[in-house]
Amino acid sequence: MSRYSATEIEAKWQEAWDKAGIFRAARTADKPKYYVLEMFPYPSGRIHIGHVRNYTMGDVIARYKLSNGFNVLHPMGFDAFGMPAENAAMASGGHPKDWTYKNIETMVAQMKPLGFGLDWSRMFATCDPEYYGQQQALFLDFLEKGLVYRKNAVVNWDPVDMTVLANEQVEDGRGWRSGALVERRELTQWFFKISDMSGELLDALDTLDDWPAKVKLMQANWIGKSRGLQFSWALTEPAHGIEALDVYTTRPDTLMGASFLGISPDHPLTKALEAENPDLAAKVAEMRKGGTTEEAIEKAEKLGADTGLRVRHPLNPDWELPVWVANFILMDYGTGAIFACPAHDQRDLDFCRKYDLPVIDTFVALDDPKPIATEAFVPLKTEKVKWIDHFAGLDVATGQEAIDTTIDWMEAKGLGTGVTKFRLRDWGLSRQRYWGCPIPVVHCDACGVVPEKKENLPIRLPDDVTFDVPGNPLDRHPTWRDCACPSCGKPARRETDTMDTFVDSSWYFARFTAPRAETPTDMAEAEYWMNVDQYIGGIEHAILHLLYSRFFARAMHICGHLPEKSKEPFNALFTQGMVTHAIYKTTGADDRPVYHYPEAVRLEGGKGYLEDGTEVEIIPSAKMSKSKNNVVDPVAIIDRFGADTARWFVLSDSPPERDVEWTDAGAEAAHKHLNRVWNLCDRIAAMDSAAPGEGDDDLLREMHKCIRDVTNGIESFGFNASIAKLYAFTNTLAKSKAGAAAQKQAIMTLAQLMSPMTPHLAEDIWAHQGGEGLIAAAPWPVADEAMLVDALVTLPVQINGKRRAEISVPADMDKTQVEKLALSTDAVQKALDGAAPKKVIVVPGRIVNVVV
């Protein structure tokens, strides 16, 4: 072998894998299937080191399963629609399509040198008409089955991106991409009926045994099942034909602490009152400026307006309460109306203190009954409290006991009904932008909203659009909107809204099973390949993507595109940590931070210096950010060290669920180790096969232990633990005095065990040592159980708990034989002095204790 040149060997073996078609997947009856998938990337233009870590993890699993006799599907594609492409077009004067496909071309060229065992023949981008045409077909099927509908709704409007955002896309009251403060608007929108599946989506979480508990908890909280009471409050005087207001509450036990009745700014009564009261209308308009998400509403300043209306308390008709419009009340959760109990709800208390409304205790702490000041008393529902003249006769009880008792009492009196509700709301999918999947419906003056015919799909996006002004170019296009009604043939208008990009990623995993099919899926292929056996991606997708995908899988099953078993599409989920890097910062002349590239900083004695000697502040383990100049370019790493070094390091330094900090020193150490393995192979290849050796069994015993430990590590996603065992075995092999045959067996096994992590180096060692075929297709080594037992173990011998001797015995020696050997030692014989021991305790492989 010559000098280790990663560049030369990596290109050679990638070509060999392609030529052999090792990673091309096809149905077969003679192997079990295994589908491994990493969340596909957005084509931003360049891959980053986080991509390398994510896809290397998936590749380790895919290669390992392939070596274990599985028929592996490991595809790759691109989540390609979305605002960044439009923003780039606006900035450059180009076209989103050109920008996107150029970026895909660049990223594929960057990914292939990493040696991922991917079936590139299945690659697609969600902006391919062949893909989004099938997505349009799914939309029509969902529409036919009543899973999608259109209605007027108050939505989150991003005034910068000029589009609607789903609740999940609003973070801290701002658009998730633009960062703009979100506004409320009422628009006609398309919605998926995900709320109809709330109970099923929640209950099925219990079946996902191989999902992280944290992800399941996040989804459960988002779905938000609650049990409460729905009941009516009669208005003292009817208003606009409304005689009573229905309220849903999860804390009916606090009914006697009511301070006011609140209604949403979007409640029908609010809208009716606005029309006749300009002052109220102005105040409500101010309330509607924030977003519609619970988070945005919770963080917003509490705003309210007294309507002048009053209601009668359900338990005391003489007790009248004011009706207020409040900006923190959601129209589409519950009934859009609440009763406020400020003593036991911080939001209500803040509102009441601001508007000088009464605060009434309904219960107090058992040990320290304090009056309510600025902080509401909100104990856990499992905590016992002292009730104050509770109408259902409660004295001391937990919150949950009080809720259950109150619901039963109110139902018995005919005053209300116990109801189960969910927080999960229907998914608004309409977006007012160009670069997305067109919604396949037509608006006809004669027929109304008409679904497009499937034979006319895909409804393609027009190429001749401009982005010189904000808004949706489809609205301004001179001809694209115009079409014939599919029903009556008269002139009609296309829907100009496009689909939320989360639709695109909610079913791509199913499309990978038959990416060229002329229907959304080929059921035979879906029946064979689904479900995804191992899905890998970030925890940040716990609610959005993963919940939507679970809904889509169910909807596709209803429409005949997925089998029953695939209603839960991902059997196992792994959420990986990030790759971080230190930030190097100084302060500029204007007191603003200046961030420096890592290569511009000299590290010395734990400190960092610029070329001119200026010391920089080092912020360790920071999230990589282009704006902070701490992004690691994988292409530069591959050019310098090779793909195998990058793969090895991102797996070796931290458990995969945790963040790992990229350091040049760590990468250099990884490269040094791979060089060492290469040189070790050279040394073993040059050994005299006839020369005697010693310790063959010891070396092979350690080899089989390494097989066991590396296998267990990969099976449990403990890649760093597997690599630690490979380091240790490399050291053992380097020091071994065993004969050539044993060392050759050991180096070839080491190559096999390293092959999922460093596939190129492993292939070269395998070939150099005379391995048959490609290591990527070779069977995974199996540990010999007989070789996992150490030849001899040393056991301490205690007499009455004190160590007096030790014996060396075969590790698998019978307990009776161990006892006899221990009793024959001089120390035990002397202690017994001819008598029999009271007891002998043998702990196999650990210790012998003689009681005299």
From Swiss-Prot:
Residues holding ATP: 626
- Alphabetically ordered keywords of this record: Aminoacyl-tRNA synthetase, ATP-binding, Cytoplasm, Ligase, Nucleotide-binding, Protein biosynthesis
The motif 'KMSKS' region: which residues? 623-627
Q: Name one GO cellular component term.
A: cytosol
Q: Where in the cell is it found?
A: Cytoplasm
> Motif 'HIGH' region: where?
41-51
The signal peptide, as residue positions, is none
DNA-binding is among the record's keywords: no
PROSITE patterns in the record: AA_TRNA_LIGASE_I
Primary subcellular site in the record, as a coarse category: cytoplasm
Identify the EC number(s): 6.1.1.4
The GO annotation for biological process reads:
leucyl-tRNA aminoacylation
Q: Which GO terms describe its molecular function?
A: aminoacyl-tRNA deacylase activity; ATP binding; leucine-tRNA ligase activity
User: Does the record's keyword annotation contain Protein biosynthesis?
Assistant: yes
**InterPro entries for the chain:** aa-tRNA-synth_I_CS (IPR001412), aa-tRNA-synth_Ia (IPR002300), Leu-tRNA-ligase (IPR002302), Leu_tRNA-synth_edit (IPR025709), M/V/L/I-tRNA-synth_anticd-bd (IPR013155), Methionyl/Leucyl_tRNA_Synth (IPR015413), Rossmann-like_a/b/a_fold (IPR014729), tRNAsynth_Ia_anticodon-bd (IPR009080)
Gene3D superfamilies linked: 2.20.28.290, 3.10.20.590, HUPs, Isoleucyl-tRNA Synthetase, Domain 1, Valyl/Leucyl/Isoleucyl-tRNA synthetase, editing domain
SUPFAM superfamilies, from UniProt? Answer: Anticodon-binding domain of a subclass of class I aminoacyl-tRNA synthetases, Nucleotidylyl transferase, ValRS/IleRS/LeuRS editing domain
Pfam families for the chain: Anticodon_1 (PF08264), tRNA-synt_1 (PF00133), tRNA-synt_1_2 (PF13603), tRNA-synt_1g (PF09334)
Catalytic reaction(s) noted? tRNA(Leu) + L-leucine + ATP = L-leucyl-tRNA(Leu) + AMP + diphosphate
Q: Give the similarity note.
A: Belongs to the class-I aminoacyl-tRNA synthetase family.
**What PANTHER family does the record point to?**
LEUCINE--TRNA LIGASE, MITOCHONDRIAL, LEUCYL-TRNA SYNTHETASE
Q: What is this protein called?
A: Leucine--tRNA ligase
What organism is the protein native to? Answer: Ruegeria pomeroyi (strain ATCC 700808 / DSM 15171 / DSS-3)
